[in-house]
From Swiss-Prot:
It is found in: Cytoplasm. Responsible for the release of ribosomes from messenger RNA at the termination of protein biosynthesis. May increase the efficiency of translation by recycling ribosomes from one round of translation to another. Belongs to the RRF family. GO terms for biological process: cytoplasmic translational termination. The keyword Kinase does not apply. This is Ribosome-recycling factor. The lineage of its organism: Bacteria, Pseudomonadati, Pseudomonadota, Gammaproteobacteria, Lysobacterales. It comes from Xylella fastidiosa (strain 9a5c). GO terms for cellular component: cytosol. It comes from the Bacteria. Signal peptide: none annotated.
Length: 185
């Protein structure tokens, strides 16, 4: 039972870190990346469809993306979705090809994005600490119901703390990496 609590806590912490990575992938750096457009949805065939399901996205040169729409009739919808996104990009449409030129980030915008990245990192740390709190509470509940001894509680809490420290260190590394990527001109 104790191992199950630890495993559950570790799984939840890993999911939090993965969610942070996915979230930070949509933060625009100076370089073009297809993951930048992951959050864009197109009204297609009666539902909201992710852009990567109606078009292929590739990097052309260092600062531009080329979107090749599979269905020619979808080009206008894709263009509208890009305008509607908060990425601040202007698409150039030529038939089924859509070109996105990413302007270089200003120093001010880089600092704003660094703050956003730092804030997301802090939110993830809070989530990890909440997972630790939940796991420790489950361990204490087991003690109350006399399923485990005090020594096992202490050992379980130490193990959960080690998992937490490792997860928070991982969050710090992800945030630091993204901040360096942002500040690189």
């Amino acid at each position: 039972m104790l191992n199950q609590i630890k495993q559950d806590a570790q799984d939840r912490m890993t999911k939090s870190i993965d969610a942070l990575r996915n979230s930070l992938a949509s933060v625009r750096t100076g370089r073009a990346s297809p993951s930048l457009l992951d959050g864009i949805k197109i009204k297609a065939y009666g539902t909201d469809t992710p852009l990567n399901q109606v078009a292929s996205i590739s990097v052309s040169e260092g600062r531009s993306l080329v979107i090749t729409v599979f269905d020619k009739n979808m080009s206008k919808d894709v263009e509208k979705a890009i305008y509607a996104s908060d990425l601040g990009l202007t698409p150039t449409v030529v038939g089924t090809l859509i070109r996105l030129n990413l302007p270089p980030l200003t120093e001010e915008r880089r600092k704003e994005l660094t703050k956003v990245v730092h804030s997301e990192g802090e939110d993830t740390k809070v989530a990890i600490r909440n997972i630790r709190r939940d796991a420790n509470q489950q361990i204490k509940d087991m003690l109350k119901s006399k399923e485990i001894t005090e020594d096992e509680v202490r050992q379980g809490e130490e193990d959960i703390q080690k998992l937490t420290d490792k997860a928070i260190k991982s969050v710090d590394e992800v945030v630091k990496s993204k901040e360096q990527e942002l500040m690189t001109v």
